[in-house]
Amino acid sequence: MSKLWLLLLLVAAFQAVHSYPAAESDYLEEPETTWDILKETWGKMKDHYLNLGKETLAKLKELKENYKTWGKEKKQQFIATLKDKLCTPQDFEEDIDYAESDEDKDLSFTMKVLLILKETLDKLKAAVGEEKEKLIQEVKGLRAKICDKLSDYEEEEEFELEEDYEEDPETTWGILKEAWGKMKEHYLNLGKATLAKLKELKENYKTWGKEKLQIFVAKLKDKLCTQQDFEEDIDYTESDEEKDPALTAKILLKLKEYLEKLKSAAGKEKEKLIQKIKDLRAKICDKLSDYEEEEEEEEEEEFELEEDYEEDPQQTTWGILKETFGKIKDRWSQLTKIQLQKIIQVLKNRYCADQNDFEDDVAESDEEQGGRQVIQKYLQKLKEFYEKIKAAVGAKKEELKKRLEETRQKFCAKLNAAAEQNDLEEDEDEERGWLGKLGKGLKKVGKKFVKKMSSAMKAGCKKGMKMLKDNAVKVTPLVCEEKTCKTLVTILTYSCGMQYTITRTNKATYLEVAFIVNGEVKAKKNVKLGDVPSCVNLGALLGKICLKGIEGKGKSSSGQANVNFCLAILADKYNVGCKFCASYANKKFKVLPPKMFSGAQDDNGEILQASDNGEDGILLDADEFEID
């Protein structure tokens, strides 16, 4: 490979390596484990370097083509000019002249190389301390290498760029690979140090009693959650009475590190850091509030480091979702079991005990009879029998009494069976709630809710069905990392990236959705599972995009309950949409391929999926699928 081509690659690689932010700035941006942070950082680095590599390669190819058109004299003039500008000044940072004179204008290639070096020096100006000294030494080293190469070129009579430059190991990629190795080693060392600190905190925490732990939580909450101006009012100095709970100071010092990094940030980066600090503060305050309200056993579960922390260093999105839905499922199951047990116990005490005054009890008020339809029917039947018995005489009365006792026994058998059930299915109540919210015209067909669509909706859906048939809409499968899943949606020739992050509070589950167009976040929306759809506007090309979070319940093939959830999006302008669904059951998490559909919004803002014939609208739900 030509020496000149190697020189240019070295220059481009140097620019790429030093254009990435200092490693320390990203290390503690997310309040997750060390491994989560490292994984996210490496992902960002990889994307960043790949983009830089593609841009650099495109520039180099363009320069290569221009270079081929030069004659020998022009090439020699280029080498002499480059060497004169780069290698003769004593003070490299001050003496490089970036303005082209008249005789230099033809040598645009020279100036482009120098501009790359100028960008590197501009970045050097923002560095301070040891980092700046290190960068200066690297710049001087690179300068010396380039000057040596230029001296070699003057001695050569002819040189041409070789076609196999991409195969040479000393390319941008080779240099980047070496840089990644150094970064990886740096992060691993940081991770080990952090893990050692976490282990130390864990051991200290185990030695605390309940009273000391409560004092720690109260003081931490008071310092962190009551100040109006978080950046100005946090006091990082410990008073004498605060020195015992050392964890308080350590957590606050960690937050102080965030704020120190914030001071050196600017523009969008600063706004991003401020938002992350506020989010972290809110999460910590929520945890502290939960901790004060829970029992001692729940307190230990909330704050104690998990034993399998070291065994699972790479917690994925699925692990986080699995834990989230597990907690939601447990809470739902516990609440329904308690409610059911109360209803059953009241009814059993009133109607199923061996009492002589059973007939009097039947005639009493129904206020305590509960709300389940099957139980109400039996109670009504018992009352009807009792009314007939009072009016009957002789053999007829005895027959009615016998039938009354048989009905009572069946009724009590139903109660006993209900008491033995582990799960309570409440689909009928949920369906009634949906019907009330969605308005008139909705009917149930099988397991789906169907609604007649207007002529305009039908026409729009048929247009959307044609686009899907013509493959004018494409959606990539979800790619998940950490708490965030990403996909790319392409409609005609317009592309839009979408990513969502799942978050959970004590009362609800949310999907934080962001739309990215041309590398910039165009819109954001928080979607609560179960809420009515909400929309964002992505401009004239893509138009209004509506979103809905859906949650459903079902059973796996083994009979165990599972939770299904979907994020549905609808491009209103094109009448096409897509559902991204997942399920958690049997301690397994599964993501399904995206499902595209043609649809529209009704007058209530609800997203309807067009039926196969395009005449009816089907209410979106969480798909039922099994995990074995």
Swiss-Prot record:
Keywords per UniProt: Disulfide bond, Secreted, Signal, Toxin
Tissue-specificity statement: Expressed by the venom gland (posterior main gland) (at protein level).
Prodomain positions: 20-368
Region (Disordered): 290-313
Flavoprotein is among the record's keywords: no
Main location per the UniProt record: secreted
Cellular compartment(s): Secreted
Parts forming coiled coils: none
GO molecular-function terms, A-Z: toxin activity
Protein modification: Contains 5 disulfide bonds.
Keyword Disulfide bond: yes
Domain of life, source organism: Eukaryota
Family: Belongs to the redulysin-like family.
Name of the protein in its database record: Venom redulysin 1
Protein's organism: Platymeris rhadamanthus
